[in-house]
Amino acid sequence: MNVRMLRRRRKLNQTELATRVGITQAYIAMLEKGSNVNPTLALLTKLAKALKVSVAELVE
């Protein structure tokens, strides 16, 4: 996933993105590191909306 790159492009820090999506900053960090997490489609949709991209762009 390209969460870190997309987040930085939007000039958001992890806490700001987490607040917009309704998850913890720690979970954003795990997503960005590629930790063994399996976000739901609902969460991917919220992330994509917050980052102003499609879900497909998010998971490329």
Residue ranges and their predicted role:
Residues 8, 19, 49:
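Alpha-helical residues within the helix-turn-helix
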Residues 12-30, 35:
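Short alpha-helical DNA-recognition segment
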Residues 6-7, 33-36, 47:
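Generic anion/oxyanion-binding catalytic loop in active/binding sites
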Residues 42-57:
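DNA major-groove recognition helix of helix-turn-helix/homeodomain DNA-binding modules
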Residues 1-9, 56:
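A short, Lys/Arg-rich alpha-helix, primarily the initiator
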Residues 4, 15, 45:
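Short glycine-/small-residue-rich flexible loop motifs, especially phosphate/cofactor-binding loops
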